[in-house]
From Swiss-Prot:
BP-aspect Gene Ontology terms: pantothenate biosynthetic process
The protein's name: Pantothenate synthetase
Pfam families: Pantoate_ligase
Organism from which the protein derives: Corynebacterium glutamicum (strain ATCC 13032 / DSM 20300 / JCM 1318 / BCRC 11384 / CCUG 27702 / LMG 3730 / NBRC 12168 / NCIMB 10025 / NRRL B-2784 / 534)
Compartments where found: Cytoplasm
GO MF, one example: ATP binding
Enzyme nomenclature, EC number: 6.3.2.1
Pathway annotation: Cofactor biosynthesis; (R)-pantothenate biosynthesis; (R)-pantothenate from (R)-pantoate and beta-alanine: step 1/1
Length: 279
C-alpha cells in the first residue's frame, strides 16, 4: 500500500492505473469504512482512500471544539485500510489541501445543503462539496463510495456531479450497525458506555417507524419526535420523513404510499449523532 501526503505524490501513484474507486474519509475509521473499501475493491482495479479532516465543513471553518476534538489516529487508520485492501492512501495536511489559506472559490450547495443537517450546521455541505470536488479532480475516480448513514451528503454529492458534469459514479453503501443497533460512526468513540446506551433510542425510533410502514399502519412522526425529545440524556435536533432524492419533507396524511427516508439527528452529551432508515 502506498501512502501519499502531497498532491503530486498522489498523481504520480495513479499513473497507468486502470479503473479507480475512491473512498473519501476523515479518518477515525471503523467497520463502516471497511465496508466502503470492500465495495470499491469489488468493482475497481485500484482503490484509493483519502484521510483528511476538512476544516471547511466544521463550524467557524475549523475554529471550534468539534474540529479540534475530532478523533485522529493515522497509524490505526492505515492499518485498517491496508488490511481492507486499499492500494493508495492520500493523507494530506491542511496546508497541502488549501495552500495559502482558505479557498476563494467554493462549491455552493444551495437549498439541498441548507435543510436538515445544513440548517443545524450552516456551511457544512459547502465545505463537504468543495473538498470532494477537489478530491475528484485529483484522483479522477471512475466510482466514489459514500456511506448511506450520511444520506444528505450522498444527495449533495449526487447533485454536485450532476450539476458540474463530473464523470464519476456515486455508489452509496448500506449503513453498518453495531450489535446493539447503533450506526457506526467515528463520533461513537466520544460516547461513554452510558451515553451509548442512551443513543440507542434513535435507531429504535427509526426501526419502529419502518415496522409501522411495513405493517400498513399510519406513521406518527410527531410521536416519534416526542419519544426522542423526552429520552434521558438526549436532545433532539431533527426528525423528518423526506423524499430520498431531494430530501424535501413529505407531508404524511395517514398512510405513506411512496418511497421515503426518515432522517434524524440527536445530541447525547456534546456528541451529535445522525441516522436514517428507508421506509
Amino acid at each position: 500500500m502506498q501512502v501519499a501526503t502531497t498532491k503530486q505524490a498522489l498523481i504520480d501513484a495513479l499513473l497507468h492505473h486502470k479503473s479507480v474507486g475512491l473512498v473519501p474519509t476523515m479518518g477515525a475509521l471503523h467497520s463502516g469504512h471497511a465496508s466502503l473499501v470492500k465495495a470499491a475493491r469489488a468493482e475497481n482495479d485500484t482503490v484509493v482512500a483519502s484521510i483528511f479532516v476538512n476544516p471547511l465543513q466544521f463550524e467557524a471553518l475549523g475554529d471550534c471544539d468539534d474540529y479540534r476534538n475530532y478523533p485522529r489516529q493515522l497509524d490505526a487508520d492505515l492499518a485498517l485500510l491496508e488490511e481492507a485492501g486499499v492500494d493508495i492512501v492520500f493523507a494530506p495536511d491542511v496546508e497541502e489541501m488549501y495552500p495559502g489559506g482558505l479557498p476563494l472559490v467554493w462549491a455552493r450547495t444551495g437549498s439541498i445543503g441548507t435543510k436538515l443537517e445544513g440548517a443545524s450546521r450552516p456551511g457544512h455541505f459547502d465545505g463537504v462539496a468543495t473538498v470532494v470536488a477537489k478530491l475528484f479532480n485529483l484522483v479522477r475516480p471512475d466510482r466514489a463510495y459514500f456511506g448511506q448513514k450520511d444520506a444528505q451528503q450522498v444527495a449533495v454529492i449526487r447533485r454536485l456531479v450532476a450539476d458540474l458534469d463530473i464523470p464519476v459514479e456515486i455508489r452509496p453503501v448500506p449503513i453498518i450497525r453495531g450489535a446493539d443497533g447503533l450506526a457506526e460512526s467515528s463520533r461513537n468513540q466520544r460516547l461513554s458506555a452510558d451515553q451509548r446506551a442512551q443513543a440507542l433510542v434513535l435507531p429504535q425510533v427509526l426501526s419502529g417507524l419502518q415496522r409501522r410502514k411495513a405493517a400498513g399502519e399510519a406513521l406518527d412522526i410527531q410521536g416519534a419526535r416526542d419519544t426522542l425529545a423526552s429520552a434521558d440524556g438526549v436532545r433532539l435536533d431533527h426528525l423528518e420523513i423526506v423524499d430520498p432524492a431531494t430530501l424535501e419533507p413529505l407531508e404524511i396524511d395517514g398512510l405513506l404510499t411512496q418511497p421515503a427516508l426518515v432522517v434524524g439527528a440527536i445530541f447525547v452529551g456534546p456528541v451529535r449523532l445522525i441516522d436514517n432508515i428507508e421506509l
